[in-house]
Amino acid sequence: MAPHHFSACMNIVIFDLETTGLSPSENEIIQIAGIRMIGGRIVEEESFATFVKPESRIPRFITDYTGISNAHVRNAPQPANALLSFSRFVGDATLIAHNGNRFDMPFIRENCIRHRLPVRTVGFVDSMSFSRKLWGGRCGHGLDAIMNRLQLSDHGARRHDARGDVKILALAVRQMWEQLSPNFQHCPVALGDGVIPFNPY
């Protein structure tokens, strides 16, 4: 599908993953979180969050970084079930993730292959596109750099916990979008394709 522009009236889910490392082929998802945005409004009551039980133990440095321990995931859903639940939450929404082209979407694709889950195509945007559109080649398009530029507070949300990161990212996306299109009618950011599990139910 050729990239095209999209507007904020669309049903959007901003999401984030936490994992045991940076390699989709070698590491595992341990947390998925998402929050819905419609018409430029963050719909906090429509949110999703789950820990995910990996096959291997969570390394200590990942626990130190994310706050997620082996105790958190001990009774969590298996990856296939967690991804199917996330797919049900997403529905027909367009997905947005930060650095998602290089991180989140490859992890989802790899996990669908690993767990033999058939996939469906959804609209997808890497929120770094908003940052690059606003600030061009300036150094730093990470979420912390964007928070500093937008003077955003974390409002007590824990960074590197997917539940906290999606709340912060939703606020950042909303502010960047508003700067690009004050009435949220149009956004000069291309919409690409992502995948999530096909859910027959």
Q: Language model features by range: what are they?
A:
Residues 2-122, 136-160:
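Conserved non-catalytic scaffold segment of RNase H-like nuclease domains
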Residues 106, 129, 167:
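Active-site phosphate/pyrophosphate-handling residues
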Residues 2-4, 149, 170-201:
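Acidic two-metal-ion nuclease catalytic site recognized across multiple nuclease folds
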Residues 121-132:
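A short, structured active-site edge motif that brings together acidic residues
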Residues 83-85, 167-171:
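Short secondary-structure transition/capping segments
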Residues 164:
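Acidic donor-binding loop at a coil-to-helix junction in glycosyltransferase catalytic cores
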Residues 101-102, 130, 153, 174-176:
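Short acidic/polar capping segments at secondary-structure boundaries
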